[in-house]
Amino acid sequence: MPARLPRRALLRTAPLTLLLAGCGFELRKPPSFAFQSIYLAVPPMSPLGLELQRALAASGSVSLVTDPRQVERADLVFELLQELREKVVLGRTSTGAVREYQLRVRLRFKVRNRQGIERIPDTEMVQQRDISYSESSALAKEAEEDLLYRNMQSDLVRQILRRLAALREI
């Protein structure tokens, strides 16, 4: 009897495995870019700019032009126009104390090629997360807030990379 149990389990899972393989499902691959070099016009200490630099360098197929005097060597120029973190009160208790916040990261950018032609026009991207607040756990909530901001920033960087990968003509 124990030898039949694994065989039954195998017979039950085999059709699901074949169905999943046949539907065309595959894991997301690293992006492939149509350009070889890019200049990032971002503020020097911008956390989003630093993460974007790391992500592009990790791709291995793109070289970063870091010297502003060498901008004309870059195939594309990424301009970060605005990076804004917001914290908005969502709810209050009956005594007027804050109960819930909404955290937002607002980002505006555009991408142009070496000739100055815009390849991605002025684009605004917004990420938002809700967070509850309690005076008794203020330090923990501050750490949670930092974590949420980092997660939103990472998500925005992934979205930017997907948009850059979608460019087929530079």
Regions found by a protein language model. Name each.
Residues 25-30:
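Bacterial lipoprotein signal-peptidase II cleavage site
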Residues 56, 60, 84, 111, ...:
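Sec/Tat-exported extracytoplasmic proteins
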Residues 77-124, 130-143:
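Surface-exposed short loop/turn segments
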Residues 139-170:
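C-terminal/domain-edge helix-coil "capping" segments
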Residues 34-84:
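N-terminal segment of the mature soluble domain
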Residues 1-18:
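N-terminal secretory signal peptides and thylakoid transit peptides that target proteins
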Residues 21-22:
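C-terminal motif of bacterial Sec signal peptides marking the signal peptidase cleavage site
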